[in-house]
């Protein structure tokens, strides 16, 4: 007896076969969802360390202390003869010094070599008495007393030295913005004459947030 006309056979013949590739497409969708979840998780993890309004980046990828931001100033040393010194007191903008009682936690100096840089310089930051005239003799003595960290920055074959930052921690001294005029950046040109267009010094002063600090520093 021919069973091809039976109801069961008819229903079987009418069943749609799975479309070619549907199973692989489903697997791809699952893989995409898994990848998306991984990316979201990674994004959340990275976001923890990103600078925000309250925690702007200060040292490399390190964030400022909670409740702190920083103000940057740039110094360009003049010509410094071989074996001689240069010093300049920190001068923050009036919009910052108006809040002179806000605490300062750290000072960072970043040496930016310009295209002509081919020298060796020593850089430090020191609290200098107001009576000091920042003479060569006075600066020389401050470099030699060992009371402050010193960054030695020198020309490299590549033109760039990896370590170009000096960090000075003031948190235990309870220094404030008003005290910053008592601090000076000091430079010693060791091996040869430093031309005025060889380096720029970027000084970052990390301090408690003030009312005007509503944007990330640039």
Curated annotation (Swiss-Prot):
It holds the Pfam family Cucumo_coat. One of its GO terms (cellular component) is viral nucleocapsid. GO terms for molecular function: RNA binding; structural molecule activity. Residues 1-32 are annotated as: Disordered. The modification N-acetylmethionine is found at residue 1. Residues 23-32 have a biased composition (Low complexity). Keywords: Acetylation, Capsid protein, Ribonucleoprotein, RNA-binding, T=3 icosahedral capsid protein, Viral nucleoprotein, Virion. Residues 12-22 have a biased composition (Basic residues). It is found in: Virion. It comes from the Viruses. Capsid protein. Probably binds RNA and plays a role in packaging. The N-terminal arginine-rich stretch does not seem to be the major RNA-binding region that allows formation of an infectious ribonucleoprotein complex. Belongs to the cucumovirus capsid protein family. This is Capsid protein.
